[in-house]
Design a protein with these regions (language model features):
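A conserved catalytic-core segment of Leloir-type glycosyltransferases
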Residues: 1-38, 56-122, 196-202
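Conserved acidic donor-binding segment of nucleotide-sugar-dependent glycosyltransferases
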Residues: 353, 357-364, 372-377
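Aromatic "clamp/platform" in nucleotide-sugar-dependent glycosyltransferases that forms part
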Residues: 321
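Nucleotide-activated donor-binding/catalytic signature segment of Leloir-type glycosyltransferases, i.e.
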Residues: 266, 270, 275-308
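A short, well-ordered alpha-helix in the C-terminal region of glycosyltransferases
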Residues: 372, 379-393, 400-406
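Short alpha-helical segment that forms part of, or immediately flanks, the ligand-binding pocket
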Residues: 306-307, 330-334, 348-349
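Conserved donor-binding/catalytic core segment of Leloir-type glycosyltransferases
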Residues: 40, 219-241, 247, 262-263
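Short hydrophobic beta-strand element within catalytic cores of glycosyltransferases
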Residues: 329, 338-341, 351
Length: 414
């Protein structure tokens, strides 16, 4: 059997402290209508990255509503995850010529077949996350559950050969969900296609309230000079997050803001073998400057430390060049810390209005925005507060639960 991630049950009513009552009431009402429904999310890693981040909070909340919710994780060797990482990149526009080779396709297909045989299928609804397990439905054609494919990446301009390979598997699902309409490939032929943005849990260890002086003390313990300015990027060690562009923008900004420090805080996940090489390359660049710090979940920087970085930093940077959503943007804004971010993917959803002035398209523009905000902290503070309200109204977990429960209800006919 596949691994089931061990999680408990949360209390949906906690959200009444931070969320509009009508949203919580609707979520509870939908839960009552679907009480006893067996729901299973499937992905490729129990930790690291946005999907795992979502499910850790999402599954316990679903259970609190009376939904029998589980989370199963597919298995794979390094070869399989190297292929699926390439598929992930190709959905975002990178080339993957090896997909034309029969042995590459067989590797993907055989792993999905093996995982299909080990999957606990005793559920009413499956939600399959991203390309890694996208072929499971194909190998379980006799299963009577409803199947939803959830795409978390920017698939607006996928590599044509990869899309042609994956599309038949995706089209066997009963519904597909994308973060935003512009991510939906025009050739996808599924009757039920919808959009919904991811969300954050304000009560998780990464987002819970921590006093500012405690956060600053944590950064002090990690070697930062808390009497100097700090900017931080939190992300996977991934090419699409443009860590080298962030370093270049920091160096340009430092010419006008002497003493500026940069933290690059990342995470590793079992389904991302590429991240090790990226981490090594980032480290090689960082050692040239004593004011660049590289930290990860393997060096003791977990969710609480990320929380501290996002609260104690003077600015958060998220210079992505492709981005499905970028949960770290919502996380930082929830803490009233302004973000300078790449004008990519789902990030603009989180930064409307005046915040959109800090969406950037180049290293130079990123550096200019960093300098302006560091020299005008009152502007950063005002917009940080505005950002928190945007997150409260649009990107808390209750809104995601409502959207998914509405979709599930429409599929199961209740």
């Amino acid at each position: 059997m596949l691994q089931k991630v061990s999680l408990g049950t949360a209390d949906i009513n906690k959200y009444r402290r931070v969320e509009a009552e009508d949203i919580v009431d609707e979520v509870v009402s939908l839960g009552n209508e679907l009480k006893g429904l067996r729901l299973c999310h499937i992905n490729s890693t129990p930790f690291g990255g946005g999907v795992a981040e979502l499910l850790v909070s999402y599954i316990p909340l679903m259970r609190s509503l009376g939904i029998c919710a589980d989370w199963q994780v597919i298995r794979g060797d390094r070869r399989f995850f190297t292929i699926t990482k390439a598929l992930h990149n190709a959905l975002q526009g990178a080339s993957f010529e090896a997909i034309e080779q029969p042995k590459t396709r067989r590797e993907y297909q055989n792993h999905n077949l093996a995982n299909a045989r080990e999957l606990d299928t005793n559920y009413d609804v499956f939600i399959v996350n991203d390309p890694q397990p996208a072929a499971l439905r194909h190998y379980l054609a006799d299963n009577n559950a409803k199947w939803i494919w959830r795409c978390h990446v920017d698939s607006s301009q996928p590599d044509e050969a990869v899309w042609d390979f994956l599309r038949p598997y995706i089209e066997q699902h009963d519904a597909a969900v994308f973060t935003t309409e512009k991510f939906i490939p025009k050739s996808l032929n599924i009757t039920n296609i919808t959009t919904m943005a991811p969300a954050i849990c304000p009560f998780s260890s990464k987002n819970m309230y921590i006093k500012k002086h405690v956060c600053r003390e944590m950064l002090d313990n990690l070697g930062f000079d808390i009497n100097r300015l700090i900017i931080t990027q939190v992300s996977r060690f991934d090419r699409w997050k443009d860590p080298f562009g962030t370093i270049d923008a920091y160096r340009l900004a430092k010419e006008k803001v002497p003493g500026l420090q940069l933290a690059l805080v990342g995470s590793f996940a079992p389904d991302d073998p590429e991240s090790w090489d990226m981490h090594a390359a980032i480290n090689a660049e960082a050692i040239k400057d004593d004011d660049i710090f590289v930290s990860s979940n393997l060096t003791g920087v977990g969710n609480m430390e990320v929380n501290a970085f996002q609260r104690a930093s003077d600015l958060i940077i998220q210079k992505s060049i492709r981005e499905g959503f970028g949960l770290v943007v919502a996380e930082a804004l929830w803490k009233e810390t302004l973000v300078v971010a790449g004008n990519a993917g789902g990030i603009p959803l989180q930064m409307p209005g005046e915040l959109s002035n800090y969406l950037v398209n180049s290293v130079e523009e990123c550096a200019d925005k960093i300098v302006y905000l560091l020299e005008n902290p009152a502007v950063a503070m005002r917009l940080g507060k505005e950002g928190k309200e945007i997150v409260r109204q649009n990107f808390l977990m209750t809104r995601l639960l409502r959207d998914e429960l509405r979709l599930i209800k429409s599929l199961v006919g209740k």
